[in-house]
Amino acid sequence: MLDSKLLRTELDETAEKLARRGFKLDVETLRTLEEQRKSLQVITEDLQAQRNSRSKSIGQAKAKGDHEEADRIMADVATLGSELDDAKAGLAELQQQIESIALSVPNLPDESVPYGKDEDENVEVLRWGTPLTYDFEVRDHVALGELADGLDFASAVKISGSRFIVMKGQFARLHRALSQFMLDLHTEEHGYMEMYVPYLVNHDSLYGTGQLPKFGEDLFHTSPLTEQVSDVPLKMLSLIPTAEVPVTNMVRDTITEEADLPLKMTAHTPCFRSEAGSYGRDTRGLIRMHQFDKVELVQITKPEDSMAALEELTGHAEKVLQLLELPYRKVILCTGDMGFGSRKTYDLEVWVPAQETYREISSCSNMWDFQARRMQARFRRQGEKKPELVHTLNGSGLAVGRTMVAILENFQQADGKIAIPEVLRKYMNGVEFIG
């Protein structure tokens, strides 16, 4: 959530910055609501002062023995109290309307983010590795998996439906090896604390990280199978779309001491997404699934450290690709392609031979104080009493399924076997080829 001061005192400037990312702020509605709020705030304060003043007069009248005057003043106070209650209710309604609009407003792009309308205008800043050329017909990961009976889409459809997968044997082991390798790298070399977190979260958590209220249709929500008959209230939960949600919410409603920052946390979880807006896209294979695993990286920093932390966190995700010897490119997202809560985002895109293109495998973002304001996640500087908002960052380190796609296709052999990258072999009991 943006600082409310920006929507009160810098409304036109804020609207202009939001327009750079394709968001039209309803300036006139906000301006009207703010004028009404200020007017009603003055009325509320005046009524409060009148009631307090008249209340004191009751005692004075009684002290003089003028009970008739005291009764008249008490009636006035009751009327003022009723008017004050109405004014407070109106003020609360106006504030709720303003907050409702504020919750739908995305983050402001950083000055270093290039202007653009969509993904076609993202800017490549680095390319690492050279895609291999093959002297045989390249198979995609689906064909490779089915040839080795390691990827079973038919059983997944029978069990759950489309966009799910059953992995078997060495393919399941490779999937597990990837997540173990990523966690070991991030905890042992990059300084992250491994976390095990819930896969079901409450709606407060989803509001905190920005999935709600705007993106509820992208989530899977729990609901009762039948009408509730118990007197116990039903608690609505949602499956996590990313470990960013539970991990970042660790600091919700907390004040962290300056000496304890930065916090660096990582978690391997399944992620669940409805892919509501993806009909017809990537219907074949593991690229776009309802359920997929991901190793997430989260950092909580002081404001002045967050941009350097974004470079560091992105570098940690890049290191995974480099050690796996997977060609990739790094792009900075333009204003029109940024995520809702992001101030600045780098995408890492891995080379997929069968598609002859780079596909996103990691998105690393500095959320600035956008999530922290929603979560009231703060820190206290040494020697200071008043806490400040932290900055939050997150990134994939990496998406396990898409990394597996890249390995299957980039390391395929003419006979359909897959060479295992050297850094993974210790997690595969020394196996050098599968398939």
From Swiss-Prot:
UniProt name for this protein: Serine--tRNA ligase
InterPro entries: aa-tRNA-synt_IIb, aa-tRNA-synth_II, aa-tRNA-synth_II/BPL/LPL, Ser-tRNA-ligase_type_1, Ser-tRNA-synth_1_N, SerRS_1_N_sf, SerRS_core, tRNA-bd_arm
Gene Ontology MF term list: ATP binding; serine-tRNA ligase activity
Natural source organism: Aliivibrio salmonicida (strain LFI1238)
Keyword Transmembrane: no
Reaction equation(s) it catalyzes: tRNA(Ser) + L-serine + ATP = L-seryl-tRNA(Ser) + AMP + diphosphate + H(+); tRNA(Sec) + L-serine + ATP = L-seryl-tRNA(Sec) + AMP + diphosphate + H(+)
Family matches, as PROSITE patterns: AA_TRNA_LIGASE_II
Keywords tagged on the record: Aminoacyl-tRNA synthetase, ATP-binding, Cytoplasm, Ligase, Nucleotide-binding, Protein biosynthesis
